[in-house]
């Protein structure tokens, strides 16, 4: 068995800039770059891809999430899913993006930043064809996340 002694690359500002120019950042790193979570520099950047070659592929710095029908025209700016779109992505792709782990952070932060007004999220959900009940479920449990 070969063991590499080469140091794994760190998530740097330059790497994030490169990824934002070439991919769409989603999931945990979208919550970080939107200001709703603290960075974990050991966690790979999560990007969406419609290339089946990258299905379930992860290297030291990038985790590729294969979503062939991902709508790249709604809520994406400069390679980053915006706040509302990140919430919508967690609702549409909970398993792929780890919604159970990361959704509480963005819900709590978004709630504070927008004084409990989720109307922009509901508008984007309608545009993406997401049922209102999916967000309503998370909102019903929002107090549990805030109290933790």
Model-derived features with residue positions:
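Hydrophobic alpha-helical interaction segments
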Residues: 69-148
